[in-house]
A protein has these predicted regions:
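Solvent-exposed, extracytoplasmic
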Residues: 90-104, 208, 212-254
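Extracellular/periplasmic ligand-binding regions of membrane signal-transduction receptors
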Residues: 50, 54, 61-95, 103, ...
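Extracellular/periplasmic ligand-sensing ectodomains of membrane signal-transduction proteins
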Residues: 83, 101-174, 178-189, 244-264
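Membrane-proximal alpha-helical signal-transduction linkers
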Residues: 353-380
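Juxtamembrane interface helices immediately C-terminal to a transmembrane segment
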Residues: 15, 19, 33-63, 67, ...
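Extreme N-terminal signal-anchor transmembrane helix of membrane signaling/transducer proteins, especially
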Residues: 4-48, 332-340
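Extracellular/periplasmic juxtamembrane segments that couple receptor/chemosensory ectodomains to their
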Residues: 200-201, 261-329
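Conserved beta-strands of PAS-like sensory domains
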Residues: 188-225, 247, 293-297, 307-323
Length: 393
């Protein structure tokens, strides 16, 4: 190889060396810029996904908290009635629960179940007996939760006593936030989560009061709302305790555990984060089998319910790093154009300013030596000084 280089002309050697040096320098500069761009883009993307997850969590948590606040307020009103000796007749219950449901913007149904000994003047049509519990069940529906009015009482359906939140509230005698469930009442099905509080007369449990929060509304306004999209093909999922889908872009996932839908080991860090009641950003393989980045925000529903939900905002890395591909192409074109321009200009300079002048000097010297050796009769013409540099002096 060295032999081949020695055979090259001076200008070619110089051009080759300059080209290699320029290419290496530009390449290093491009790699540094690429690395810094990716690092910055990665940091900003993770920050954005985390902030978006936090923003949605800050929208959803108040919905649930509002429901519990209304329930506990009504719970307090009923307790005060009992302390004052006011009978819990149909009118009192109707007014209390109707006001509760009408105030809520997210609940579709509210219900109160009073054990048989504590329901005064209960209507026979409201009497239910199920799961070893007997009493009077009153169910109320709000036809339009976003507006005042529209609340009315509907027929009692004993399936309400099958709600896990109702059963747990009776057994544990505390406020319970249930699991995502598909509810069918009055022949209409919808996705919901139940919030239930116990009712006491002194220290004696006399029944429960609950609401069915309409998750379909949350899905439409938050999960499926395209205005909430930050990257192409991203999606929002709301996970209840245990990583169960409460809302997602695919309604068929409702009620399923995320770990059952996506069995890739990388998902473990997300399920662990929810189990530890923490938030963060994680790189993982999403349920579509693509590399993704997910922002997770975990929050507790109300106070001391022990129910922790999470919002997962996931975006494929191909979408997150899409700007980087544009930067890379632009950089590559710029590097090649710069390299070609620099090499062309330097080659032109070497050929005109160095090689041509060196050739003239070399020819003049050879002719001068011929004159000294009497190989020619007349002296060669002297060189013209065209530059005040090493070759021109």
């Amino acid at each position: 190889m060295l032999t081949s280089l020695r055979k090259l002309k001076f200008g070619t050697k110089m051009n080759l060396i300059v080209a290699i040096v320029v290419l290496v320098c530009i390449g290093i500069m491009a790699l540094v810029i690429f690395s810094q761009s990716r690092s910055t883009l990665d940091k900003e993307a993770k920050t954005m996904l985390y902030n978006v997850a936090q923003r949605h969590a800050n929208k959803i948590a108040p919905i649930f908290d509002e429901s519990f606040a209304l329930l506990e307020n009504t719970q307090g009103v009923i307790n005060n009635f009992l302390k004052a000796g006011i009978t819990l007749d149909n009118k009192t219950i109707d007014e209390s629960v109707s006001s509760l449901l009408d105030t809520s913007n997210w609940a579709k149904y509210a219900y109160v179940f009073l054990f048989e000994p504590y329901a005064h003047n209960g209507l026979q049509k409201d009497f239910v007996s199920k799961n070893g519990k007997s009493g009077y069940l009153m169910i109320y529906r709000d036809d339009d939760p976003t507006r005042i009015g529209g609340v009315h009482r509907v027929n009692a359906e004993s399936k309400v006593l099958d709600f896990s939140a109702v059963q747990n509230a009776i057994q544990e005698k505390r406020s319970i936030f249930g699991v995502p469930v598909e509810i069918t009442l009055e022949g209409e099905s919808f996705h919901a989560v139940n919030a239930v509080v116990p009712l006491f007369s002194g220290n004696q449990l006399i029944g429960v009061l609950g609401m069915s929060i309409n998750l379909d509304t949350i899905i439409q306004q938050i999960v499926l709302n395209k205005e909430n999209s930050v990257y192409e093909n991203d999606f929002i999922s709301i996970l209840s305790t245990g990583g169960v889908y409460a809302a997602s872009d695919d309604i068929s996932l409702f009620g399923k555990k995320i770990a059952e839908v996506n069995t890739h080991p990388s998902l473990q860090q997300i399920t662990d984060a929810q189990a530890a009641h923490t938030s963060g950003v994680y790189e993982y393989i999403n349920r579509h089998g693509k590399e993704a980045i997910g922002g997770v925000s975990t929050f507790e529903v109300w106070r001391n319910t022990g129910s922790f939900w999470s919002v997962l905002v996931s975006a494929p890395q191909t979408s997150v790093y899409a700007p980087l591909r544009k930067i890379t192409i632009t950089m590559l074109v710029s590097v090649l154009a710069s390299f070609a321009s620099i090499v062309f200009i330097i080659s032109l300079f070497v050929r005109l300013a160095l090689v041509k002048r060196l050739s003239s000097i070399s020819n003049a010297l050879f002719e001068f030596f011929k004159y000294l050796n009497h190989q020619r009769k007349d002296a060669p013409n002297p060189l013209k000084i065209i530059a005040q540099d090493e070759l021109g002096q």
